[in-house]
């Protein structure tokens, strides 16, 4: 991520949910999902970020 988007920071906003804020089928209840934002708020990065996560084994 640092090489692809210099200066952009990622922030994890949620990784586990036990309060019922997500849909019934959400992987947050199993600790297998994460909500992330980018410091530049560019949502166009999210598809590439998802691909990078899969390539890294997430």
From Swiss-Prot:
Pfam family, one: HH_signal
Gene that encodes it: ihh
The keyword Protease appears for this protein: yes
Highest taxon, organism lineage: Eukaryota
Gene3D superfamilies, sorted: 3.30.1380.10
GO BP terms: cell fate specification; cell-cell signaling; proteolysis; regulation of gene expression; smoothened signaling pathway
Positions that bind Ca(2+) 2: 14, 17, 19
GO MF term set: calcium ion binding; patched binding; peptidase activity
Residues given in the record as Zn(2+) binding sites: 28, 35
Lineage, uppermost ranks: Eukaryota, Metazoa, Chordata, Craniata, Vertebrata
Subcellular location per the Swiss-Prot or TrEMBL entry: Cell membrane; Secreted, Extracellular space
Domain notes: The indian hedgehog protein N-product binds calcium and zinc ions; this stabilizes the protein fold and is essential for protein-protein interactions mediated by this domain.
Family (UniProt): Belongs to the hedgehog family.
The record's account of how the chain is modified after translation: The C-terminal domain displays an autoproteolysis activity and a cholesterol transferase activity. Both activities result in the cleavage of the full-length protein and covalent attachment of a cholesterol moiety to the C-terminal of the newly generated N-terminal fragment (N-product). The N-product is the active species in both local and long-range signaling, whereas the C-product has no signaling activity. Cholesterylation is required for N-product targeting to lipid rafts and multimerization.
Entries under PANTHER family matching the protein: HEDGEHOG, INDIAN HEDGEHOG PROTEIN
Organism per entry: Trigonostigma heteromorpha (Harlequin rasbora)
Entries under SUPFAM superfamilies matching the protein: Hedgehog/DD-peptidase
Major location (coarse): membrane
Protein name: Indian hedgehog protein
